[in-house]
Swiss-Prot record:
This is Ribosomal RNA large subunit methyltransferase E. Specifically methylates the uridine in position 2552 of 23S rRNA at the 2'-O position of the ribose in the fully assembled 50S ribosomal subunit. It is found in: Cytoplasm. It catalyses: uridine(2552) in 23S rRNA + S-adenosyl-L-methionine = 2'-O-methyluridine(2552) in 23S rRNA + S-adenosyl-L-homocysteine + H(+). GO terms for cellular component: cytoplasm. Its EC number is 2.1.1.166. Belongs to the class I-like SAM-binding methyltransferase superfamily. RNA methyltransferase RlmE family. The keyword Transferase applies. It is an enzyme of class 2 (transferase). Its main location: cytoplasm. Keywords: Cytoplasm, Methyltransferase, rRNA processing, S-adenosyl-L-methionine, Transferase. InterPro entries: RNA_methyltr_RlmE, RNA_MeTrfase_FtsJ_dom, rRNA-MeTfrase_E, SAM-dependent_MTases_sf. Pfam families: FtsJ (PF01728).
Length: 237
């Protein structure tokens, strides 16, 4: 072991066997990540829980009694945080987690293993919530190819589809929160969202790794499709 620049003991993984360099570096990063260790102590399923916690601490998005949708929810770190914040376990709020993958049970969270792109998904979601959602959030990341431009377009495309889903299930005044990666490719997405939301901004919580281009798009004050329709009508005149 050695100490890093903060004075903490740093774990190194010896090379050997068939472990690839990329796997070795990933394992070292996990072993030396304080958020990973804290997540284990706090009972969270992933370090991502602290990203949502830090964003919520700053912007106060999650309140008791709210209805929340967590897209691409597995393994469930964000759902755990949301359930605690809105009081889902005791019935005050509701959290519906959606993913193609299976997810272990989270107290107070309703899980649906489905594709949110399915045309029937918005209606099914409303039935599970008993109405619209106050917040739609997504920590999803698209599968990468290693080709930077292609990956950026895939990521933005995924967020665009999540935003379209959100526009079908959010209540007026609702919030959309989604992971993006810093690039010029999301400029058009920002423009689109500004038509439907009172405020749109990028935020980067401390729990996001410093060497990562990861950040989050936060859109608040959902106005529905009325603002977009009015703008389109004005442009057509």
């Amino acid at each position: 072991m050695a100490k890093d620049t903060t004075g903490r003991m740093r774990v190194t993984v010896k090379s050997g066997g068939r472990m690839k360099l990329s796997s070795k570096l990933w394992l070292e990063r996990q072993l030396n990540d304080p958020y990973v260790a804290q997540a284990k102590r706090d009972g969270y399923r992933s370090r991502a829980a602290y990203k949502l916690t830090e964003i919520d601490d700053k912007f106060r998005l999650l309140k008791s009694g709210m209805a929340v949708v967590d897209l691409g929810a597995a393994p469930g770190g964000w759902s755990q945080v949301a359930a605690k914040k809105v009081g889902a376990a005791d019935g005050r709020g509701k959290v519906v987690a959606i993913d193609l993958l299976e997810m272990g049970e989270v107290p107070g969270v309703t899980f649906a293993q489905l594709d949110f792109l399915d045309p029937s998904a918005p209606e099914r979601l409303r039935e599970m919530l008993g109405g619209g959602a106050d917040i739609v959030m997504s920590d999803m990341a698209a599968n990468t190819t290693g080709h930077r431009k292609t990956d950026q377009l895939r990521i933005v495309g995924l967020v665009e589809t999540a935003a379209m889903f959100a526009s079908e299930v959010l209540k007026p005044g609702g919030t959309f929160l989604a992971k993006v990666f810093q690039s010029g490719a999301d400029a058009s997405l920002m423009t689109e969202l500004k038509r439907d939301y009172a405020s749109v901004k990028h935020v980067k919580p401390a729990a996001s790794r410093k060497d990562s281009s990861e950040r989050y798009l936060l859109a608040t004050g959902f106005r529905g499709g009325a603002a977009r329709d009015a703008e389109a009508a004005a442009e057509a005149e």
